[in-house]
Amino acid sequence: TPEPEPDAKPNGTSGSIVQIQDENGISDYILNENPDLIINVVDATNLERNLYLTTLLKELGKPIIVALNLYDEFKKLDYKLNKKDFVELLGLEIVETSARTREGLDILLEKAINYKNKQDLNYKHHLNSFIDSEIEKIENEIISNGSFEKAIKDYSSYYLAVKLIENDSHLIRILEEKYGISDFSFIKKHQDILAKEYDEEPEIILSEARHGNVKGIVKKVLTTSFKNR
């Protein structure tokens, strides 16, 4: 039975609690609502599976706090997490929580208040050097393209670049309808470069690179007890 998500709100704040299970949830809610802060509730006992969604959320360029939920179960399993390296590699704030015991919720709420609307995020993204180079080129084109001027105030240039590479229909529709952007032809040359290098569709290329990145992070920071392997 899954635990309930941490749901307390500090006095003087308002907001809604939305459970996002997959990438479709990101498109359906976050793109439309454009929140000031995202609290990403992660099952600490199954980090690798859960951190893929975290990676997608990070691409949005919004303030994010990762709540490592079920942390009481994590400790019972005798798992060990190198928190310092985890924070450094992930590039996000983390808080250990348990919705069942309410452990860490006060810290989570305090961080949420302080982190909301944070501007100097300076997130670092890394898939691999080849892909990163193409994404950076697209970012530069987006930033210098006057038709994207309003869009990059709401969405990070990194996120726009990645989603345009992936031909994300939801985002393209928003860019067309909300921002009046109609010319995306400059993306194709970058898609072709990636397809030639990897002999695969751009969406699959990026997905596999994200999974590889997550796997690498978990391998470096997580130690599981021998009896639970």
Features from the language model and the residues they span:
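Extended helical scaffolds that flank P-loop GTPase cores
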Residues: 91, 118-229
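Gly-rich Lys/Arg/Thr-decorated short loops/hinges at beta-loop-alpha junctions or inter-strand turns
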Residues: 1-3, 33-35, 194-195
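Switch/connector loops and helix/strand junctions flanking conserved nucleotide-binding motifs
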Residues: 4-7, 47-49, 73-77, 102-107, ...
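Switch II (G3) loop of P-loop NTPases
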Residues: 1-19, 44
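A short hydrophobic beta-strand->loop->alpha-helix junction that borders the nucleotide-binding pocket
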Residues: 1-2, 42, 97-100
